[in-house]
């Protein structure tokens, strides 16, 4: 195993117009400050303020949006990063691990990854993801492509059907069909940063948001050694070359993860578990008294001095004493949040350091807060209560079903663009107006300029004389539609659906 030297991981070079030569500590910090500016000022971050965390289309400003959640994750990520660096300093290991002049970039990379971690999420969260994937599966039938060419291939797209004697073109068709049916917020985040917004972030900063390492076209089970790291798609076929370059620049193993990504993941886990419960109380799904009882009942055996006693019971007792003359709700969540952070942040830092060799190599096949400890049990307690009493609430389920219908409906509306032949769509894009295609012309005009330019750039790199041309053109056309719809905010998607369905 290679020695731990973070100077080989915190790569401050960029894909385009990268600074050259050696840099001082201050100059490297300025490079990552530039990353911060690019991220904070990006439209993708601003859109998070109109995407909700649990309750779509929520008008109550006290309930978290994706932006306020991401800011909370950012703060927790910073806390964990500082705790790790402080412990390494106490152990006199900063210089040994090549971090003595990289503490600032270490913190900044984690913070900005936390702020960005949700930028690829579509409207209506996981139900938006499910709607996109189900819609494409019902048209591309990727499982039909898993075998050899067959007469009953149900794929409705002629250029994507398998054909006898056309290997390896059939392999490309298989990859494309699988890839398009695996929309995932984390993979879309990578696509946003590189292909759509062209943010040109440092390799280290992008590496930190590559949460999962499975390509979206992967079929079959992942290797057991990386089953956790590959449990979801992490990037698309459209970003394959970029990710290959990223792995080279960051010295990552084929399915390995960037070391600081574990910190971002832990910060997200800690933040959303408490936040979802607080939002549920704000929405009057249950009272704070009922929440405490749910937590108490779900914990199981209660022993004096247990972690539950130190965190949840302590918060409950302090909130009942009302020493701060504030509402019981406010006090309970303040103490619960503080107690949770004070236990889980140091534990996350300790887990990171204790497993640093495997984490540095990128092959630690677990989350930091995924083990048989009471700390992991506490996190699971919060998650399970939310699953049982929040996400299954009729109001939440109704909103999720509405969101699923909105996204499915928008895909139906834009389907005429996907039904055009490669020749027709190419002509439409190049001329921007085709009298014989009035509906398709108007639908194309509704797509954002950024997404259309990304499509044009991608297809311009394909040789139109090859057999791959119609397959890859259709792939990028589907990406164009997915990019546009997934980039909408909850409210915009809702309003756009109502407008185009003429229900207003």
From Swiss-Prot:
Its EC number is 3.1.5.1. HAMAP family: dGTPase_type1. Belongs to the dGTPase family. Type 1 subfamily. This is Deoxyguanosinetriphosphate triphosphohydrolase. Homotetramer. It comes from Enterobacter sp. (strain 638). InterPro entries: dGTP_triP_hydro_central_sf (IPR023293), dGTPase (IPR006261), dGTPase-like (IPR050135), dNTPase_1 (IPR020779), HD/PDEase_dom (IPR003607), HD_domain (IPR006674), PHydrolase_assoc_dom (IPR026875). Keywords: Hydrolase, Magnesium. GO terms for biological process: dGTP catabolic process. It holds the Pfam family HD. The keyword Cell membrane does not apply. The keyword Magnesium applies. GO terms for molecular function: dGTPase activity; magnesium ion binding. SMART domains: HDc (SM00471). Residues 66-273 form the HD domain. The gene is dgt. PROSITE patterns: HD (PS51831). It catalyses: dGTP + H2O = 2'-deoxyguanosine + triphosphate + H(+). PANTHER family: DEOXYGUANOSINETRIPHOSPHATE TRIPHOSPHOHYDROLASE (PTHR11373:SF32), DEOXYNUCLEOSIDE TRIPHOSPHATE TRIPHOSPHOHYDROLASE (PTHR11373).
């Amino acid at each position: 195993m290679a020695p731990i030297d973070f100077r080989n991981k915190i790569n401050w070079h960029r894909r385009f117009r990268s600074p050259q030569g050696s840099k001082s500590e201050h100059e490297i910090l300025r490079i990552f400050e530039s990353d911060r500016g690019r991220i904070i000022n990006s439209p993708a971050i601003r859109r998070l303020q109109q995407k909700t965390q649990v309750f779509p289309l929520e008008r109550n400003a006290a309930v978290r949006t994706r932006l306020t959640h991401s800011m909370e994750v950012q703060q927790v990520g910073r806390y964990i990063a500082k705790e790790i660096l402080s412990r390494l300093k106490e152990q006199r290991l900063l210089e040994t691990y090549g971090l003595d002049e990289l503490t600032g970039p270490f913190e900044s990379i984690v913070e900005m990854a936390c702020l960005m971690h949700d930028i690829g999420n579509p409207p209506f969260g996981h139900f938006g993801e499910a709607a996109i994937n189900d819609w494409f599966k019902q048209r591309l039938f990727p499982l039909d492509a898993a075998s050899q060419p067959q007469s009953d291939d149900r794929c409705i797209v002629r250029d994507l059907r398998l054909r006898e004697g056309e290997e390896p073109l059939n392999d490309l068709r298989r990859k494309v069909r699988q890839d398009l049916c695996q929309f995932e917020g984390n993979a879309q985040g990578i696509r946003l940063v590189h292909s759509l917004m062209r943010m040109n972030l440092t390799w280290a900063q992008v590496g930190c948001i590559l949460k999962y390492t499975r390509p979206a076209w992967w079929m079959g089970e992942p290797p057991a050694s990386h089953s956790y790291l590959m449990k979801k798609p992490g990037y698309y076929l459209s970003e394959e070359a970029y990710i290959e370059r990223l792995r080279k620049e960051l010295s990552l193993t084929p399915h390995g993860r960037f070391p600081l990504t574990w910190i971002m993941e832990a910060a997200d886990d800690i933040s959303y578990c408490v936040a979802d419960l607080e939002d549920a109380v704000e929405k009057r799904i249950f009272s704070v008294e009922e929440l405490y009882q749910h937590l108490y009942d779900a914990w199981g055996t209660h022993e004096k001095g247990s972690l539950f006693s130190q965190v949840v019971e302590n918060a409950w007792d302090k909130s009942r004493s009302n020493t701060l003359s504030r509402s019981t709700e406010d006090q309970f969540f303040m103490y619960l949040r503080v107690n949770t952070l004070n236990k889980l942040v140091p534990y996350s830092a300790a887990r990171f350091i204790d497993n640093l060799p495997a984490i540095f190599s990128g092959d630690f096949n677990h989350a930091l807060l995924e083990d048989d400890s009471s700390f992991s049990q506490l996190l699971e307690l919060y998650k399970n209560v939310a699953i049982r009493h929040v996400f299954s609430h009729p109001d939440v389920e109704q909103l999720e079903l509405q969101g699923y219908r909105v996204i499915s409906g928008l895909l139906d509306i834009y389907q005429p663009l996907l039904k055009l032949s490669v020749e027709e769509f190419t002509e439409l894009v190049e001329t921007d107006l085709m009298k014989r295609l009035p509906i398709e012309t108007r639908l194309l005009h509704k797509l954002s300029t950024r997404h259309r330019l990304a499509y044009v750039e991608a297809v311009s790199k394909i040789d139109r004389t090859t057999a791959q041309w119609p397959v890859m053109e259709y792939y990028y056309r589907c990406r164009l539609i997915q990019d546009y719809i997934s980039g909408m905010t909850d409210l915009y998607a809702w309003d756009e659906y109502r407008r185009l369905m003429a229900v207003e």
